[in-house]
């Protein structure tokens, strides 16, 4: 029996590699987003800690220098939190972009796999037709051989 050789197998292989790369890039983007969100959470936690310290200082004694230091720290945390929110947004956009590339790569791979399946089905039909033709020829040959030998 003839062996099936898909003429565009190298393209399918490339599409598989591109999909793997897109999947890796998506995973990296998700990891980066998670890291950025953790950083933002730590900043928010530090800010909350400073705010608790400030409320304790305000209710206890009036240490103006310490109060100003903590208020300044809260402002710095607000600034850092805002910057980190921007980083989180960038990371979210990168995740979305990577998701779209992965989706596109998966669609392209599936298209080429369908083409390969259709080519394989055509190949099987051709082989079947060829085998049927050979059987018909063999039967026809045997019939004509028998008919010819009976006439003698």
Residue ranges and their predicted role:
Residues 1-152:
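Charge-rich amphipathic alpha-helical interaction elements
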């Amino acid at each position: 029996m003839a062996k099936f050789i898909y003429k565009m197998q190298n393209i399918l292989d490339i599409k598989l590699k591109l999909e793997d790369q897109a999947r890796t890039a998506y995973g990296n983007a998700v990891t980066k987003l998670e890291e950025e969100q953790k950083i933002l959470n730590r900043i928010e936690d530090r800010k909350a800690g400073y705010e608790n310290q400030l409320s304790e200082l305000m209710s206890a004694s009036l240490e103006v220098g310490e109060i100003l230091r903590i208020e300044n720290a809260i402002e710095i945390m607000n600034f850092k939190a805002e910057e980190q929110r921007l980083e989180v947004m960038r990371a979210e956009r990168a995740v979305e972009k990577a998701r779209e590339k992965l989706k596109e790569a998966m669609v392209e791979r599936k298209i080429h796999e369908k083409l390969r399946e259709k080519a394989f089905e055509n190949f099987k039909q051709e082989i079947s037709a060829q085998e049927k033709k050979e059987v018909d020829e063999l039967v026809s040959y045997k019939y004509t051989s028998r008919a010819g030998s009976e006439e003698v």
